């Protein structure tokens, strides 16, 4: 009976972690980006954070390389024109750091979903490159901010 509690705790922790982790689906080059009009000298990266009840008060900065490009607040969206082709590290940090690498090509369009997962104190950022179809659909549900 003494060994029941640690085994139960370990099994519960494993189930919770598996349920909370994002499902990663590899993107093919066809679905990862869309073409912009011919002759465009930049890549367009769309960042968005869908409205969720969990963590709606917490915002975090999303960086491309070394500079902040977007503030991920609940129900927000933003666009970045990136002129340097090649892989770029997109990262965010609250109590933990999350990063993804985008294979940026000029003349292409990319979508990055920013969400917030459970953390010990304030939540952990999650960044995920999504397909063009899914990104456009989710981005359409977020209102454009008025200036």
What does each model-identified segment do?
Residues 1-21:
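Sec-dependent bacterial lipoprotein signal peptides
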Residues 20-147:
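Short loop/turn and low-complexity linker motifs enriched in small/turn-promoting residues
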């Amino acid at each position: 009976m003494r060994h029941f509690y640690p085994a139960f705790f370990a099994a519960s922790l494993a189930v919770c972690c598996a349920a909370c982790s994002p499902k990663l689906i590899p993107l093919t080059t066809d679905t990862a980006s869309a073409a912009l009009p011919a002759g465009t000298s930049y890549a367009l990266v769309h960042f968005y954070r869908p409205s969720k009840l969990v963590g709606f008060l917490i915002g975090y900065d999303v960086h491309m390389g070394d500079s902040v490009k977007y503030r991920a607040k609940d129900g927000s969206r933003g666009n970045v024109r990136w002129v340097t082709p090649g892989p770029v590290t997109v990262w965010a940090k609250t109590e933990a750091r999350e990063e993804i690498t985008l294979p940026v090509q000029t003349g292409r369009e990319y979508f990055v979903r920013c969400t917030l997962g459970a953390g010990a104190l304030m939540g952990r950022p999650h960044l995920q490159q999504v397909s063009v179809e899914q990104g456009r659909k989710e981005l359409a549900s977020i209102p454009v901010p008025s200036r």
